[in-house]
Amino acid sequence: MSEEQARAEAPAGARQRRRSELEGYSVSLASLKLSPMYPEEEQRTTGGISSTAHYLDGTFNYTTNPDATNSSVDYYSVAPEPQEENLQPLPNGSSSPPVFVPSSPQLSPFLGHPPAGQHTAQQVPYYLEPSGTSIYRSSVLASAGSRVELCSAPGRQDVYTAVGASGPSGASGPSGAIGLVKEIRYCSVCSDYASGYHYGVWSCEGCKAFFKRSIQGHNDYVCPATNQCTIDRNRRKSCQACRLRKCYEVGMMKGGFRKERGGRIIKHNRRPSGLKERERGYSKAQSGSDVREALPQDGQSSSGIGGGVADVVCMSPEQVLLLLLRAEPPTLCSRQKHSRPYSELTIMSLLTNMADRELVHMIAWAKKVPGFQDLSLHDQVQLLESSWLEILMIGLIWRSIYTPGKLIFAQDLILDKSEGECVEGMAEIFDMLLATVARFRTLKLKSEEFVCLKAIILLNSGAFSFCSSPVEPLRDGFMVQCMMDNITDALIYYISQSGISVQLQSRRQAQLLLLLSHIRHMSYKGMEHLYSMKCKNKVPLYDLLLEMLDAHRLRPLGKVPRIWADRVSSSPTTTATTPTTNTTTTTTTTTHHPSNGSTCPADLPSNPPGPGQSPSP
């Protein structure tokens, strides 16, 4: 080879060496589709090398500039964004390889290289991409990138993510750059894109205007179908009645505003609610001496009540709910095998046996209610005597809430309406119980709400007394009121954590508390039926159950019965008591029952009075 031929081939070899070196750093061009945003060719000259991008063919050509000097070669992206100020050249000394990546028409890369001298080995650019799709990135990014979810919309698939190497939080380094994504919200009524927070919920302009017209004018909307029309983006105008109903269901209300912004509302100087005052009391750790100063000084309260009130008032709603859930008694079994169909005597024997055993567990449960053991023995007995059947009934309702048409008295004692009708007078009570169970099932009663309602029944039974009533007033009435307020606050607190609107929270509280009046009415019906069956000698009654029943008939409430006092003052050790018969240890007197004209034996205490005692009247 002559000297002239070697001299002529030298530039070509240098050009080939530079191009191979460049292709070693770049990604495969066959796997990258060039963007349709740049249909024409573009030629750029940098550092003696001219690069031409053929966007239609998807190829690159490199030629040597004959007038180039021996300056350093620098490379840039061949397909820059329309706004070039968003791109930064790679600084001298950067460890990132030169990469030729065409820009995407949908997703734009943000090059976040720091100034010279501050570059780190972990620095990678950030990208925004839909989940589950491919991304334009370099080999360094593919090995070091981490994915962090930014926002998502319920029921939609377009979830946007941020990719970076700064950790799980997605926050960039001191010099990193990341584009903020606008959070996408959807209308709570029709699932269209929401334009803002209107009337208490996120909604679109159409549903916002529809609700505004509906609450301002006279809306006599009538559904032509069954009031169950589907309201979505395409069918929201098909039924105005169902659309307005759904607006109320999702929580739209007149005057609703976004809590973090406040809205256009007029501020009033109102006193804080009782719940807020109690929450402030929890954080301040209110002492018992402060509570004693607030107690009434009329002499009706017991001497040791101050500490009990302090313990109850300083208890947070979470603590109250936890204690009530832990206090729940176990589910019992009847442990008696009888062949079906049941007779009237068999059913009444099973039910009274279960009721007597549950009463024993009820006393143990009541002692675990926050503050109950701080009450006097008189008040404990009076509260239990006044509410025992209501507590048994709400427990029966809770066990039967997921079995429509049946009542679960025990795990092995499940009765339906037809079996209850075989007992005289039981059909009406069964219907009332099943209707109440259905109502609680519709409301989707939660266990936390159930334990609060059960404790409210116990404490509210003796909250009021009248001058003409033979029932003695509670001696620790202030303490009982504090206990009931604390449990009511726990119920309100739990409902407030459900995520529904304020209007729906108040409505649910009212719906739950109003059902307690139905339970009390059923307890009166059940008491009359149980007493009539007792008078007809159709069922044996147990000592504890008989004591409860006679408390409403033969004694004025307030006198502490012997059996009740023994069981409330001591922990129960047995799970059942012996039945009381009317033939051996019971002295009977004949009285006339006004309802059915039969004779009813009025039982007296079976044990003779002790020394120095007189028989009970």
Swiss-Prot record:
Residues 253-315 are annotated as: Hinge. It holds the Pfam family Oest_recep. SMART domains: HOLI (SM00430), ZnF_C4 (SM00399). Ovary and testis. Residues 1-186 are annotated as: Modulating. A zinc finger (NR C4-type) spans 187-207, 223-247. Residues 573-591 have a biased composition (Low complexity). It is found in: Nucleus. GO terms for biological process: cellular response to estradiol stimulus; estrogen receptor signaling pathway; regulation of immune response. CDD domains: NR_DBD_ER, NR_LBD_ER. It comes from the Eukaryota. Keywords: DNA-binding, Lipid-binding, Metal-binding, Nucleus, Receptor, Steroid-binding, Transcription, Transcription regulation, Zinc, Zinc-finger. One of its GO terms (molecular function) is nuclear estrogen receptor activity. Residues 606-617 have a biased composition (Pro residues). Residues 187-252 bind DNA. PANTHER family: KNIRPS-RELATED PROTEIN-RELATED. Binds DNA as a homodimer. Can form a heterodimer with ER-beta. Composed of three domains: a modulating N-terminal domain, a DNA-binding domain and a C-terminal ligand-binding domain. Belongs to the nuclear hormone receptor family. NR3 subfamily. This is Estrogen receptor. It comes from Ictalurus punctatus. The lineage of its organism: Eukaryota, Metazoa, Chordata, Craniata, Vertebrata. The gene is esr1.
